[in-house]
Curated annotation (Swiss-Prot):
Gene3D superfamilies: Immunoglobulins. It comes from the Eukaryota. Its main location: membrane. This is Starch-binding domain-containing protein 1. The LIR motif (LC3-interacting region) is required for the interaction with the ATG8 family protein GABARAPL1. The C-terminal CBM20 domain is required for the interaction with glycogen. The gene is Stbd1. Expressed at high level in glycogen-accumulating organs such as muscle and liver. Trace signals are also found in brain, kidney, and pancreas.
Length: 338
């Protein structure tokens, strides 16, 4: 928008200068109605040509005589003067936008300085750049605009203060860090004092605090021992076998090859008296077989004789009892004898 206004101002100035030059040129030319020009200021009185005085010595119908050399020279000088005036006016009009821009820059800088909040310093780099632009712009235009002496001093003082700001801000940051460290240290001391000594600082005695501390230590020791004991018991329970291997053995000589010895009992692993578990023949009339039974369990059982898949003979004795326990066992019995 500023460029548009500048162009309008320049165009208007040039148009006005052109009109003024045309008006002056018309007024300086000889009259069209036969009016004679006034004599020039530097011309002698005798050399002014009167109207109708031609070289022939008489007027010829009111016609103006031919212009003399002196009149031509004076007209040329007049044209040069008016041309120079036009050029100077155009130069002045061309400098108007630049001067207006410089004035706007100065006004913006003053407004920026007035609107800076209290306790905050504007950016030193931007201030230095604007100051350099101000110093360069007036110099490039022949010193037409400069800061007053008081404002230059204020700018220099502000620049020096801004140059010293980083160190001062660093000192402030260090002071804040030190204060925060001290505050954190004090908080840690307060917490440790209250957690270690209990209510000593709240009206209690030192002996009471010692007793409470010892009691807490005893409680923690007991809980630790209890935890270890439970842990040991858990390990023992996990190491205890869920089943044990019981090997049943008996000496018996069968009469035929279709006969064999078996074992039965009240546990499901022994057939619950309805079925049987066959024993394998080894040698010399020894029959043997291993059965897995639950650990630490009491079962009732007996040897039986099986022929053609049927029980044909039971031991001639009461039921046998077995305590399985937690280890593998070998149960060796004699037929019919406990």
């Amino acid at each position: 928008m500023g460029a548009v206004w500048s162009a309008l101002l320049v165009g208007g100035g040039l148009a006005g200068a052109l009109i003024l030059w045309l008006l002056r040129g018309d007024s300086g030319a000889p009259g069209k109605d036969g009016v004679a020009e006034p004599p020039q200021k530097g011309a002698p009185p005798g050399e002014a040509a009167a109207p109708g005085d031609g070289p022939g010595g008489g007027g010829s119908g009111g016609l103006s005589p031919e212009p003399s050399d002196r009149e031509l020279v004076s007209k040329a000088e007049h044209l040069r003067e008016s041309n120079g005036h036009l050029i100077s006016e155009s130069k002045d009009l061309g400098n108007l936008p630049e001067a207006q821009r410089l004035q706007n820059v100065g006004a913006d800088w003053v407004n920026a300085r007035e609107f800076v909040p209290v306790g905050k310093i504007p950016d030193t780099h931007s201030r230095a750049d604007s100051e350099a632009a101000r110093n360069q712009s007036p110099g490039s235009h022949g010193g037409e605009w400069r800061l007053p002496k008081g404002q230059e001093t204020a700018v220099k003082v502000a620049g020096s203060v801004a140059a010293k700001l980083p160190s001062s801000s660093l000192l402030v940051d260090r002071a804040k860090a030190v204060s925060q460290d001290q505050a954190g240290h004090e908080d840690w001391e307060v917490v440790s004092r209250h957690s270690s000594w209990g209510s000593v600082g709240l009206g209690g005695s030192l002996e009471a605090s010692r007793l409470s501390l010892n009691q807490r230590m005893d409680d923690s020791t007991n809980s630790l021992v209890g935890g270890r004991g439970w842990e040991v018991d858990g390990k023992v329970a996990s190491l205890k076998p869920q089943q044990v291997s019981i090997q049943f053995q008996v000496h018996y000589t069968t009469n035929t090859d279709v006969q064999f010895i078996a074992v039965t009992g009240d546990h499901e692993s022994l057939g619950r008296w309805n079925t049987y578990i066959p024993l394998h023949y080894c040698k010399d009339g020894l029959w043997s077989h291993s059965v897995f039974l639950p650990a630490d369990t009491v079962v009732e059982w007996k040897f039986v004789l099986v022929e053609n898949k049927e029980v044909t003979r039971w031991e001639e004795c009461s039921n046998r009892f077995l305590q399985t326990g937690h280890e593998d066992k070998v149960v060796h019995g004699w037929w019919g004898i406990h």
